[in-house]
């Protein structure tokens, strides 16, 4: 699920930078460099020493919030908040340990779930998966339409 959030952030950053390129805020060389870093960036300098450094994942996440702000007027960072909560669940040093437990508000008691008892995962907003899937598709389709309208595509199959 984190990969879905991060990939949605990546397509949102590509969308944002494409708009900046079309508005001539970025040169074609700057835009090309951003795309290179976005698609080929890695921290693996042992096997890929000449590869560009990747974008920090939070820059990608923030690009998704930028899209929400521009398109829908959101004033908070909903996407980042969802990603932060999801990240907290996956870390072995904190909240992730307590996924199968309930903690009292005063933090003094932990109630463990029984072996056969289902834990109410909806408490952790897994509906974010549905939202993020839809959100990714929305950004992708809008970006693709912009590219098809504004760019000369070399192959007919890319146009349909």
Where are the language model's segments positioned?
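A cross-kingdom marker of C-terminal helix-rich interaction/assembly modules
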Residues: 1-160
């Amino acid at each position: 699920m984190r990969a879905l959030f991060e990939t949605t952030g990546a397509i949102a950053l590509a969308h944002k930078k494409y708009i900046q390129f079309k508005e001539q805020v970025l040169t074609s060389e700057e835009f090309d460099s951003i795309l290179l870093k976005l698609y080929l960036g890695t921290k693996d300098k042992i096997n890929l020493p000449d590869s560009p450094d990747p974008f920090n994942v939070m820059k990608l996440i923030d690009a998704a919030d930028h899209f929400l702000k521009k398109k829908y007027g959101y004033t908070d960072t909903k996407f980042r908040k969802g990603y932060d909560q999801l990240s907290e669940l996956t870390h072995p040093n904190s909240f992730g340990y307590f996924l199968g437990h309930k903690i009292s508000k005063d933090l003094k008691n932990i109630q463990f779930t029984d072996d056969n008892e289902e834990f109410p995962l909806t408490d952790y907003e897994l509906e974010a998966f549905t939202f993020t899937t839809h959100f990714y598709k929305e950004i992708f389709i809008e970006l693709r339409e912009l590219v098809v309208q504004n760019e000369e595509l070399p192959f007919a199959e890319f146009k349909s």
